Amino acid sequence: MGAMAQNPPNLRPDLAPRLVIDSPRREGQPTIGMVSLGCPKALVDSERILTRLRAEGYAISPDYAGADAVIVNTCGFLDSAKAESLEAIGEALRENGRVIVTGCLGAEPDYITGAHPKVLAVTGPHQYEQVLDAVHGAVPPAPDPFVDLLPATGVRLTPRHFSYLKISEGCNHSCRFCIIPDMRGRLVSRPERAVLREAEKLVEAGVRELLVISQDTSAYGTDWKGPVRFPILPLARELGQLGAWVRLHYVYPYPHVRELIPLMAEGLILPYLDIPFQHAHPEVLKRMARPAAAARTLDEIAAWRRDCPDITLRSTFIVGYPGETEEEFQTLLDWLDEAQLDRVGCFQYENVAGARSNALPDHVAPELKQERWERFMQKAQAISEAKLAARIGQRLEVIVDEVDGEGATCRTKADAPEIDGNLFIDEGFEALSPGDLLTVEVEEAGEYDLWGRAVLV
């Protein structure tokens, strides 16, 4: 196995890195490999680390054999993600032997070194300086300012036409099933000017879609205690002026989210909200330590759709949470029927080391969790299929992601990369390139995907 894995554990509704960086290498140039696991926030951390290393004269290798050392950026959100991270570390040790570990699982160094005592160093999430120090110790830098050129946007692990834009780090919530605040700390928002400057550089470099991410996007700037109550609102408006698609992810359902909807109706940002509702029964939400207001949530959804009829709503849910009864699960199914969400992800609850939910009574049996997951996804799939069938005959603006000999893979404004569906063009695609925007008439629909033909407008 010579090539380094770049696929994250398939555990969360997140976006996976799809490209491996392969930078030209001059003679004698130190070279680093990177394995990036987990969510988009971790991917941005990987990009920042690689950018710093490129600036110091390191080349980036796409395989183990060409690397002087390998960085593994780990995921530690769920126990199954931890196991997959340990597997990736083990593979890097076997294939290369010189491994530096960082990321969320790095917050548990004893857990890592207990399994892999030969790793060179372990650092926690977004500890960039410690990672660089570890790299310097393993492979000293050898910069050449006349040869080592760095793109204005830094090193990116996404296709050229879309990019993640991380606006904050950490989270102030205390959900019982989650340990992210323990791993990444409390909310720290990036200055608005820094976010906008990064976004401007990305758009100038050809990025057509900005995917705004954080642990809690709608809480952006609330840690400043400044005169603006909800800084996400002016930030979203400013981003919407740049001429790229702007897609909001990880939006916690605060009441002020309704103030984002007019920006969507105006066309400044995409009419798309990624909101993790997690459940609908008030008692389950209370056990999760999340807002127990499912009825009000339905009212909010109705208001969003009234003010922006084209809005697409994506959410994620947990089934089999400790203590979940059949009645509580049925409430979730009934809520989904009424909410008619466009895009849905669902996960079976599992214990996470350090999570307070582990101590809750009445854990649900694995076979019952699986059965409930299947019932939930069957309903969600039927809703998706009906909603997509209603798109047949409509003309939609799409962005091209990939083009090969068989056709073009595109996305509508209602679809985020990797986690949502695609729109496929099978004819008349030869002149298209990734990043192109065009109008397509929908001709066929499936459970999650669409097919159509390009039209001239």
UniProtKB/Swiss-Prot annotation:
Cofactor: how bound: Binds 2 [4Fe-4S] clusters. One cluster is coordinated with 3 cysteines and an exchangeable S-adenosyl-L-methionine.
Residues annotated as domain MTTase N-terminal: 30-140
Protein's GO biological process: tRNA modification
Keywords of this entry: 4Fe-4S, Cytoplasm, Iron, Iron-sulfur, Metal-binding, S-adenosyl-L-methionine, Transferase
MF (Gene Ontology): 4 iron, 4 sulfur cluster binding; aspartic acid methylthiotransferase activity; metal ion binding; protein methylthiotransferase activity
Catalysed transformations (reactions): L-aspartate(89)-[ribosomal protein uS12]-hydrogen + (sulfur carrier)-SH + AH2 + 2 S-adenosyl-L-methionine = 3-methylsulfanyl-L-aspartate(89)-[ribosomal protein uS12]-hydrogen + (sulfur carrier)-H + 5'-deoxyadenosine + L-methionine + A + S-adenosyl-L-homocysteine + 2 H(+)
UniProt protein name: Ribosomal protein uS12 methylthiotransferase RimO
Organism: Cereibacter sphaeroides (strain ATCC 17025 / ATH 2.4.3)
